[in-house]
Amino acid sequence: MFAAPYSLAAGARVDRRAPAWDISEWINWDPGNVDSLSGKVIVIDFFQLWCPGCNKFSGPLLAHWQQKFADSIADGQLILMKIHTVFEGHSYQTVRRLKSYIREKKIDLPVGVDRHADGERLPETMRRYRTRGTPEIAIIDRDGIIQFQEFGYFEPEPVEAMIQSMLVPTRA
């Protein structure tokens, strides 16, 4: 745990080990798994391609963070990724449409397709992370502990400060 000079909603603080994600296919590139990313800060955007909040909030926010934290991404300290976690509209939100959406939105982050177990309405990673819907963002610290997880809109500035506090300062 770290001392935090920022204010987050009490419900957003999680402090539990991040479960493995269960991905049927990676688009753009495969970032690895929670264990192989030990020592890195991980930001996951759980989204659906037809989700208004994802298109208006979490998608643009991750694009902003991709620029804001470009140095930390380049030196391997920070991984930003998206998981397409479909719990409704299964026949519309296909992998083919997802790939088209990724091209259209010019998303170059790793995008995982959350795996559905046979007969299950909710995909595996969504269940493991106990997400409440989309968009939902989870932030995992360098020790593999979920430090933040929030459904819907939140104030980005305190979360950006939290991410910054988890990164190792680079020497100039």
Per-region residue spans from a language model:
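N-terminal export leaders
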Residues: 1-2
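Thiol/disulfide oxidoreductase modules built on the thioredoxin-like
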Residues: 105-107, 113-162
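Extracellular/periplasmic catalytic domains that process cell-envelope and extracellular macromolecules
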Residues: 12-14, 36, 73-75, 103-106, ...
